[in-house]
Amino acid sequence: MDNLNLNKHTSGQFNAELEYIRTQVMSMGGLVEQQLTDAITAMHNQDADLARRVVEGDAKVNMMEIAIDEACVKIIAKRQPTASDLRLVMAIIKTISELERIGDVADKICRTALEKFSQQHQPLLVSLESLGQHTVQMLHDVLDAFARMDLNEAIRIYREDKKVDQEYEGIVRQLMTYMMEDSRTIPSVLTALFCARSIERIGDRCQNICEFIFYYVKGQDFRHIGGDDLEQLLTDHRRVDEA
C-alpha cells in the first residue's frame, strides 16, 4: 500500500504520531480481513478448529481498537489538531469502530457455524460463501483506499455495495424456497438467513469507511444524504477530480 501524503509539521514527533496511528489502523484492518476470510472458510468447510481460532482472535481485534482509540485521544489532547489533521484523526476513530464490528461479525459467524451447521447443510452454505468472499474483497479494497485516501476508489467501492445487496436478496429468495419445499429445513434456514444478513452488513460497514474517506479528502460529511442526491454528489466530485 502506498503511504498517505500527510501534512508536514514543524514537530517531527507530531508527524510520527500521525503516521503511527495510521499504520496501526492498517494493521488492525489486515487482522480483521484475515479474521473474516477465516470465518467464511470455517463456515463453508465446517472447520471447527479454524472457527475456534477466529473466536479466540476477536480479543486481539478489540484490544487494537482500544489502543488506537487511546492514541487518537492523546493526539487530540496534546496536539489539538486542526483542518485535515483533525479530519484524519476523526476518520481513524470512526474507521476502527467499523472494523471492530466487522470483527464481531466474523466471531458470530464462527460461533453459529460451530453450534448450528453440519455437513447436511452444505447446500445452504455455498451461496453464503460466495457472498462472504464478495464482502472480503470489498473490505480489502476499502482498506487499500483508506491507506491512500483514494477518493475515486472509495466512490467505486461505495457503489459496489449495491451488488452485495442484490446478491443477499437472491440468497434470501433461495432460502425461502428451501423452507417452503421442506418445513424440516426451517431452523437451519433461519440460521443461514441470520448469517447472510450479518455478512451483508459488512458491505454497509465498508460503505461507512468510504464515507470517512470522503470526509477526510473533501471536508464534507456525506452521512445521511443517501439515494440519488448522494449519487449526484459523488459524480460531481469525481468529475472535478478528473478535470
Swiss-Prot record:
Record GO biological process: intracellular phosphate ion homeostasis; negative regulation of phosphate metabolic process; negative regulation of phosphate transmembrane transport; phosphate ion transport; regulation of DNA-templated transcription; regulation of phosphate metabolic process
Inactivation phenotype: Entirely abolishes the secretion of proteins from both type III and type VI secretion systems, T3SS and T6SS, respectively. Transcription of phoB is reduced by about 25% compared with wild-type. Transcription of esrC is completely abolished. Transcription of fur is increased.
Main location: cytoplasm
Localization, UniProt: Cytoplasm
Span of the signal peptide: none
Any one annotated GO CC term: cytoplasm
Keywords recorded for this protein, A-Z: Cytoplasm, Phosphate transport, Transport
GO molecular function: protein homodimerization activity
Matches recorded under InterPro entries: P_transport_PhoU, PhoU-like_sf, PhoU_dom
Function: Part of the phosphate (Pho) regulon, which plays a key role in phosphate homeostasis. Encoded together with proteins of the phosphate-specific transport (Pst) system in the polycistronic pstSCAB-phoU operon. PhoU is essential for the repression of the Pho regulon at high phosphate conditions. In this role, it may bind, possibly as a chaperone, to PhoR, PhoB or a PhoR-PhoB complex to promote dephosphorylation of phospho-PhoB, or inhibit formation of the PhoR-PhoB transitory complex.
Entry similarity comment: Belongs to the PhoU family.
Record text on subunit structure and interactions: Homodimer. Interacts with phosphate regulon transcriptional regulatory protein PhoB and ferric uptake regulation protein Fur.
Protein name: Phosphate-specific transport system accessory protein PhoU
Gene: phoU
